[in-house]
Amino acid sequence: MKEQKWIHEGLITESLPNGMFWVRLDNEDPILGYVSGRIRRSSIRILPGDRVKIEVSRYDSTRGRIIYRLRNKDSND
């Protein structure tokens, strides 16, 4: 049976080595996030201040996988 995961939105607050980030979720919980393989292969840049979607396991709610970088509303592209 496949493990159930929750998907949350949050804000990148700090960048760490090896594709790890501190993410502040919309409910103000800090969580340690790592970049998914699809984002890593696509060379998508994630910087502090970006909004992301993060997938969190029900068994370990302190870590999550960043699965999508949301577009900024004020960008010109």
Swiss-Prot record:
S1-like domain mapped to chain residues: 1-71
Q: Which segments of the protein form a coiled coil according to its record?
A: none
Where in or outside the cell is it found?
Plastid, Chloroplast
One protein family per Pfam: eIF-1a
Alphabetical list of Gene3D superfamilies matching this protein = Nucleic acid-binding proteins (2.40.50.140)
Using the UniProt record, give the first listed, main subcellular location.
Answer: plastid
Q: Name one GO molecular function term.
A: translation initiation factor activity
Which keywords are on file for this protein?
Chloroplast, Initiation factor, Plastid, Protein biosynthesis, RNA-binding, rRNA-binding
Q: Name one GO cellular component term.
A: chloroplast
Q: How does it assemble?
A: Component of the 30S ribosomal translation pre-initiation complex which assembles on the 30S ribosome in the order IF-2 and IF-3, IF-1 and N-formylmethionyl-tRNA(fMet); mRNA recruitment can occur at any time during PIC assembly.
NCBIfam families documented for this protein: infA
Which purpose does this protein serve, as stated in its record? One of the essential components for the initiation of protein synthesis. Stabilizes the binding of IF-2 and IF-3 on the 30S subunit to which N-formylmethionyl-tRNA(fMet) subsequently binds. Helps modulate mRNA selection, yielding the 30S pre-initiation complex (PIC). Upon addition of the 50S ribosomal subunit IF-1, IF-2 and IF-3 are released leaving the mature 70S translation initiation complex.
Q: Which family does it belong to?
A: Belongs to the IF-1 family.
> What's this protein's name?
Translation initiation factor IF-1, chloroplastic
Species of origin:
Spinacia oleracea
Supply the gene name: infA
